[in-house]
Amino acid sequence: MNQSLLAPFGTAIERVEAGLNALRQGQGVLVVDDEDRENEGDLIFAAETLTNAQMAMLIRECSGIVCLCLPDEKVKALELPAMVEHNSSQYGTAFTVSIEATVGVTTGVSAADRVTTIKAAIADNAKPSDLARPGHVYPLRAQPGGVLTRRGHTEGTIDLVQLAGLKPAGVLCEVTNPDGTMARLPEIIAFGALHNMPVLTIEDIVVYRKSLLAKVG
């Protein structure tokens, strides 16, 4: 990762703390993974604070494949099976079947409908029958252990919202350029500056979590 580009955002610890503060305030954060992995940046919001305007941004400025990151126990509680029996994707991205709220939506595609679906899924009393399958929101199952187990955006999202003291559910979408290509670090930093969003990396979250473990130890 080109640390010189990230230097204006502070140290790894400072970048994560800025991200946590943004999430607590209901704002978005940009998270970049390792250059030797997907080398992509995702725009992430806490699911519980997600607004229709923020969903519209995810649809308009990003790839449009809006994903809901959930911990393993929530996926099991909602009885969401894996999208495929044998996952052969390069990085083992753990998609479940797609979902739609059974109440309060029309076609399920609009920003408002997708937010309604997400709020239905993350409700404390949510039941499998609250969600139709398939739909227009794509849940992702996070590995237990977070980024210390798997260095993916799914795990990074759950780690961040939990570290921020929020409900363990987050929404992400890959940032794209206007021409449809994937945004890399320079474009992601420019996007963050334009929208006043902090930028951090999966590696930063690893460093932050290890520092917390060291303090406990």
Swiss-Prot record:
Transmembrane segments: none annotated. One of its GO terms (biological process) is riboflavin biosynthetic process. GO terms for cellular component: cytosol. One of its GO terms (molecular function) is magnesium ion binding. Binds 2 divalent metal cations per subunit. Magnesium or manganese. The keyword Ligase does not apply. D-ribulose 5-phosphate binds at R37, E38, D42, R150, R151, G152, H153, T154, E174. It is an enzyme of class 4 (lyase). It catalyses: D-ribulose 5-phosphate = (2S)-2-hydroxy-3-oxobutyl phosphate + formate + H(+). Homodimer. This is 3,4-dihydroxy-2-butanone 4-phosphate synthase. It comes from Shewanella baltica (strain OS195). The lineage of its organism: Bacteria, Pseudomonadati, Pseudomonadota, Gammaproteobacteria, Alteromonadales. The gene is ribB.
